[in-house]
From Swiss-Prot:
Cofactor: [4Fe-4S] cluster; [2Fe-2S] cluster
Binding site residues for [2Fe-2S] cluster: 104, 136, 196, 266
Family: Belongs to the radical SAM superfamily. Biotin synthase family.
Entry EC no(s): 2.8.1.6
Naturally occurring in which organism (per UniProt): Clostridium beijerinckii (strain ATCC 51743 / NCIMB 8052)
Residue ranges of domain Radical SAM core in the record: 42-268
Chain sites annotated for binding [4Fe-4S] cluster: 60, 64, 67
Protein name: Biotin synthase
Length: 316
């Protein structure tokens, strides 16, 4: 693994034509150490912190099996319309003061349209004017014109998870397709936005699905890859799935670093499964994280995250 890490540092890139079976069987410590070396050499010691606000909750038409916000599932989440832009601005300012680097509004639903989209643009313009934080957005399937409007409002990155591999996608969602996701990502890129896209592990997929997802993201040129671990929510079709081990989480992080050596490998939901906040995650190739709460689940405390990461040698 050390030799492969050196080759990747020197420019080699893993592709679909490579036999990647060894990534699943090699010693865990060796693959994690190699991934950490790649991260340190190609990405440096800086860490990227982002946080999100649930800008519109619930009542989603899509049937993603993992999601508590779908109208297809009976869950006990708060449902509300788009937040007042002033509420969003206040929350953004608070997170910027806490040292967070990126801030994103995330909305439930297939797409954000009409007056809700107008409110989102207004909120981004207000944040762009009054804050210095990097602005990200996650609003489902938008038109090319909408992506341009977001960019003009100050948004620099668009979030659109592919969730899993192409071959496994139909097992997770049937109201939209994997190809719909890819089209969305390319529209955002064509509008001049960077893209944040990853997925969820622990939904019953195989290791080959995870590798396939990592390669697809590399082929798309995605620069920020959030990796979520399924946190089963009562009322969703996946509520009774047994969670994957911490060892599997670490191997997944390392594999994604080997395949996407210069990207932000962003640990998202699931870090609370680690008692120490996920120290080993950041020694296995990760150099970014969502801090604070997730959309419908509890996350990690930002101040504690900063202390932990600085102790590990990262610069905030």
């Amino acid at each position: 693994m050390e030799k492969l890490a050196e080759e990747i540092i020197n420019g080699r890139r893993l592709t679909r034509s490579d036999d990647l079976e060894f990534l699943l069987t090699c010693d865990l410590k060796k693959i994690c150490d190699g991934a950490n070396k790649i991260r340190k050499t190609l990405c440096g010691e800086s860490v990227d912190l982002c946080t999100i606000i649930n800008g519109r909750s619930g009542k989603c038409s899509e049937n993603c099996k993992f999601c508590a916000q779908s109208n297809h599932h009976k869950t006990e989440i708060k449902k509300y319309d788009f937040l007042d832009p002033n509420v969003i601005l206040k929350d953004c300012k608070k997170n910027e003061a806490n040292g967070v680097h990126r801030y994103s509004i995330v909305t439930a639903g297939r797409a954000l349209v009409g007056s809700d989209f107008d409110k989102a643009v207004q909120a981004y313009k207000m944040m762009n004017k009054e804050c210095s934080i990097n602005l990200c957005a996650s609003h489902g399937f938008l038109s090319e014109e909408q992506f341009v409007l977001l960019k003009e409002a100050g948004v620099t990155m668009y979030h659109a998870n592919i969730e899993t591999s192409k071959r496994n996608f139909h097992n997770i969602c049937t109201t939209h397709s994997y190809d719909d996701k890819i089209k969305e990502i390319k529209l955002a890129q064509n509008a001049g936005l960077k893209v944040c896209s990853g997925g969820i592990i622990g939904m019953g997929e195989t290791w080959y699905d995870r590798i396939d997802m990592a390669i697809s993201l590399s082929e798309l040129g995605v620069i920020s890859i959030p990796i979520n671990v399924l946190m089963p929510i009562k009322g969703t079709p996946l509520e009774n799935l047994k969670r994957i081990s911490n060892y599997d989480i670490l191997r997944t992080i390392a594999i994604f670093r080997y395949i996407n050596p210069t990207a932000y490998i962003r640990m998202a939901a699931g870090r609370t499964y680690f008692e120490d906040g996920g120290i080993e995650i950041f020694q296995s190739g990760s150099n970014a994280t969502i801090t604070g709460d997730m959309l419908t689940t509890v996350g990690n405390n930002t101040c504690q995250d900063k202390i932990m990461l600085q102790t590990l040698g990262f610069s905030i």
